[in-house]
Structure formats: structure tokens, C-alpha cells
């Protein structure tokens, strides 16, 4: 039963993130020491927000995440992640339709129905076991497919790296298309949103340690990794376009 929690898709996604981070290390090592970056005209402001986010992580969110992982059994933790991934599929489906990826949208719609029923509201990722892989689409990628440029790099308080174009995802995917925002009971809504954020932060703690060990300038490293990751996602994993982006 435990294999329903630790899926092939989750492993492959984590592997992609590590690959992107390693590529960013090589790109960062080849970069000049010049602070001029056309992608980041707000660097002074962004570095301030980055420092604020790091402080909040160190003082509040990392301790909470560590406690969450310490007291939560692995299968429960994975089930919680699966539950929120299942809700995220609704946003993914909407963006796939907007990008005219109707085959993927149909697959993910079937995935959502199966996981929501057989998978007990998504706690078990039954669909991946059936060959219905999870896809990752958001409104920022949709705008990119429609021809919108990335715009300047922006570090968002509490959320981290983004671009002007990708800020739309916070409004559309995390707001309008997020079913949790339509829950009428405020305590239930707040509890789910908080758990979602804690789950999100806890999943990237190991990545944060890797960044700290691999880079002299964490801010620059994360910025480069962000743009590489977004290029990879926008091109649906097309390695040629991804590297050439």
C-alpha cells in the first residue's frame, strides 16, 4: 500500500529539480561577477525581500516544518501531499484547456476523478499506479504559451521567486482556481491553507540545504535556478528548448 504514496512521478519530479539545480551551479560558475542583470532590475528590493523570507524561514517556518516532519508518520505526510496535489489538478486541468492541451486535460480530469473517489479524496495516488501521470501547469505557463514575456524577476514575501508574468499564478491558481478558497467555514479554510503551506515548505527543506552548500551567493543561485526551472516547465520538459532558453 505504501507504494501508492511514493510515486514514480514524484521521484522523477524531484530528480528534475536536482538536475536544474546542478545545471544552475554550472551556469553560475560560468557567470561574470557583474551585478547587472536585465532580468532583475529590482535587485535591491528583491534581495531585501529574500533576506526577509530567509529570516522568517529560520525563525518560524523551518522549525514548524521540522516539527511537522518529526511528529507526522511518513505515510501520513505523503498522503497530505497527495491530497493537495489532487486539488491542484483542478487548476492544472483549467490551464491545460487554456493552452489547448486537450489530451492532457482529459487525462488529468480522469486522474482527478479516480483519486478523489478510489483514492479517498486524493490521499492515495491511485491514478499514477494506473499510468495517469501528474502534469504541472499554471497560469504563468499559460500566459507564456500565449506569448507574454516573463517580465522582471520579483521575490514575493513568503512565497519566494517569481516574475511579473508568474505573479498571475498566485491570483489565478492559488486563488480563483483553488477550491479551498470557496470553503465557507473560516476555521476549516484557514486550517487547510496553513497545512498546505507547511506541507509545501517542508518538501523543499532538503533543496534549501543543497542551495546553501552549493553556492556562494544564494540569491543569485536561486534566481538562475528559477528561470531554468520555468523554462523547463513552459517547454514541457523539452531539453533542447530548455537549455537554449
Residue map of PLM features:
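N-terminal secretory signal peptides that target proteins for export/translocation
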Residues: 1-13
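Sec-dependent signal peptide recognition
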Residues: 14-21
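C-terminal motif of bacterial Sec signal peptides marking the signal peptidase cleavage site
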Residues: 28-29
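Post-signal peptide N-terminal segment of mature Sec-exported envelope proteins
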Residues: 37-60, 67
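Short amphipathic alpha-helical coupling elements at transmembrane boundaries
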Residues: 51, 66-69, 92, 96, ...
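A glycine-rich, hydrophobic loop/mini-helix early in the fold
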Residues: 74-100
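Mid-length scaffold segments of soluble, non-membrane domains
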Residues: 86, 95-163
Amino acid at each position: 500500500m505504501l507504494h501508492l504514496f511514493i510515486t514514480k512521478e514524484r521521484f522523477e519530479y524531484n530528480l528534475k529539480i536536482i538536475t536544474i539545480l546542478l545545471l544552475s551551479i554550472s551556469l553560475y560558475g560560468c557567470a561574470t561577477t557583474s551585478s547587472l542583470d536585465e532580468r532583475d532590475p529590482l535587485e535591491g528590493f528583491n534581495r531585501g525581500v529574500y533576506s526577509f523570507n530567509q529570516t522568517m524561514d529560520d525563525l518560524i517556518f523551518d522549525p514548524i516544518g521540522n516539527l511537522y516532519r518529526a511528529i507526522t508518520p511518513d505515510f501520513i505526510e505523503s498522503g497530505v501531499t497527495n491530497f493537495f496535489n489532487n486539488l491542484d489538478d483542478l487548476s492544472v486541468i483549467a490551464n491545460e484547456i487554456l493552452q489547448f492541451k486537450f489530451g492532457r486535460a482529459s487525462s488529468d480530469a480522469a486522474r482527478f476523478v479516480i483519486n478523489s473517489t478510489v483514492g479517498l479524496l486524493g490521499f492515495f495516488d491511485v491514478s499514477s499506479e494506473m499510468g495517469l501521470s501528474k502534469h504541472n501547469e499554471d497560469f504563468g505557463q499559460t500566459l507564456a504559451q500565449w506569448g507574454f514575456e516573463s517580465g522582471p524577476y520579483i521575490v514575493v514575501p513568503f512565497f519566494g521567486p517569481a516574475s511579473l508574468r508568474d505573479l498571475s499564478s498566485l491570483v489565478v491558481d492559488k486563488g480563483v482556481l483553488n477550491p479551498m478558497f470557496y470553503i465557507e467555514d473560516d476555521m476549516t479554510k484557514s486550517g487547510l491553507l496553513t497545512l498546505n503551506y507547511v506541507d509545501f515548505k517542508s518538501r523543499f527543506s532538503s533543496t534549501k540545504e543543497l542551495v546553501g552548500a552549493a553556492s556562494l551567493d544564494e540569491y543569485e543561485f536561486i534566481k538562475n535556478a528559477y528561470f531554468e526551472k520555468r523554462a523547463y516547465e513552459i517547454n514541457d520538459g523539452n531539453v533542447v528548448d530548455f537549455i537554449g532558453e
